[in-house]
UniProtKB/Swiss-Prot annotation:
Keywords for this protein: Calcium, Sensory transduction, Vision
Native source species: Lithobates pipiens
Role according to the record: Arrestin is one of the major proteins of the ros (retinal rod outer segments); it binds to photoactivated-phosphorylated rhodopsin, thereby apparently preventing the transducin-mediated activation of phosphodiesterase.
Molecular-function GO terms, alphabetical: G protein-coupled receptor binding
InterPro entries: Arrestin, Arrestin-like_C, Arrestin-like_N, Arrestin_C-like, Arrestin_CS, Arrestin_N, Ig_E-set
SUPFAM superfamilies: E set domains (SSF81296)
Top-rank lineage group of the source organism: Eukaryota
Family: Belongs to the arrestin family.
Recorded GO CC terms: photoreceptor inner segment; photoreceptor outer segment
Single GO biological process annotation from the record: visual perception
Keyword flag Calcium: yes
Miscellaneous information on this protein: Arrestin binds calcium.
Protein name: S-arrestin
Pfam family, one: Arrestin_N
Amino acid sequence: MSGDKKSRSVIYKKTSRDKAVSVYLGKRDYVDHIESVDPVDGVVFVDPDLLKGKKVYVTLTCAFRYGNEDIDVIGLTFRKDLFFARIQVYPPVEDVKCLTKVQERLMKKLGNNAYPFVMAFPDYLPCSVSLQPAMSDVNKACGVDFEIKAFSASNLEDRYHKKNSVRLLIRKIQYAPDQPGPTPRAETSWQFFMSDKPLHLTASLAKEVFYHGETITVAVTVTNNSEKTVKKISTSVEQTANVVLYSSDFYTKTVAFDESDEKVSPKSTYKHTFTLLPLLAYNREKREIALDGKLKHEDTNLASSTLLKEGIDRTVMGILVDYKIKVTLTVSGLLGDMTSSEVSTELPFILMHPKPDSGAKESEQEEDFVFEDFARDHLKDELQPEEKEEEEEDEK
């Protein structure tokens, strides 16, 4: 019974205000596989009568936003394009050689006025990431986003109007690697003044890759052969966001914390397993925490670790995210509790989403299309100042 039912495939659609151009995409998330990136493959449907001889172009833009775009300071906008590509879709300049199954079925369904396009990502672009603003700065966005735009114009020199264009936000994302690296483990010793033997610390994780929402356990062993007393042991998950634009800035934030007040006396050993759960839900009020890019007003999560292709410079513009476990020992000083000091070690790890089940990939059998409109209201706050002016003029 259920086997006779066709599966349903969501197609994302958006139409220009003048109804002359519509864009259809089979997905909104495009996966960076490290060695390659899924191209943006879509279809543009045109109404030649409404176009009145105009051409239709499609652009792919990666932009870094770092402020409130409503404010224009002496002609400077708070946006920098990291990548821009443009192709002419109508009239077609060249045929798309290899159509995807979704493109083939869309063109068959839409008819003769449907034209396919393919836009490729270069391998050096960052993924979709944003920094969490303060509660009072909700409109001051800072992050990397990607946009597909289609517009009609007589020629590229002419300024097109908002009503003649379609804008769709998409995401570039990564999933956890298939082959994780070695299990993180750190061993270190400290030699203190007036102590013949050192304080030894061993910390390890169960694996290198953890998924969002998964509990992280940290096994800690303290062998105290010194004359000092370890008063406290703490563990934390540290997120480091390397924001590279005009300079390279680092933002390190603690996103999970656990500690033990168990004292480790001289000439003794202590073992303990700490539990950490890095979640955005516990960090809603912390400013400048890196988050995965989001579409519309849906919820998101802490940013995933950034994986770079071998040979790619880490100074590429964007936001690069790393995670580490920090284990800190608070040790008594010469005057006891009055002059305590801290020593620590670190364990890098990867925090990402698991790769979806391969069974969720495009099926060989035909699927029913379900068309979902890109909501224009959700993008209204993303417009640049000059585009908002055009929109207001168009609505008059």
